Amino acid sequence: MTLEGPFIYRLEYRDRCLQSVKDEQGCATKFAPPMTKVGFKLYIVCRLSVVLYVGVTNRPIRDRLRFGENPNGASGYHGYKWMDQPGPYELFIWNVKGGGDNQRMEIETLEAEIVYAVRAKIGQWPSGQTEIHFHESSNEDRRLSEEILATIYNC
């Protein structure tokens, strides 16, 4: 498995409704391939350089965000908890390439290692995190999670 990215966006929400998507320079934009394609992605939502949420999706990123914008609670899903905090948000996305049959498990392992590394760094789980998929990890998973967090904290 290799990761392509990060692709960095700034998001503005009002009442769980996406108002704007901006690139790193602050210019209005749209999500672009590979974020608009089906395929695994690791994504991290931050606010003021604080990690709020770490997630994995196989959907286009806009579809995944839209799902989190519209919680109904009836099926037990209450949407993204981080959307209850004021923005703007930074969205970091890595596109997953390769990985074969175990791609989901590999990216979920990395997701869990990043969440754990955030907890180790700040003493608390990310405030918007509501679930984690745990799998046995390797030294490479732990190294990569630290590298990803260094990228986020240095932006």
List the predicted regions and their residue ranges.
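Boundary/linker segments flanking structured domains
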Residues: 1-40, 46-52, 57-155
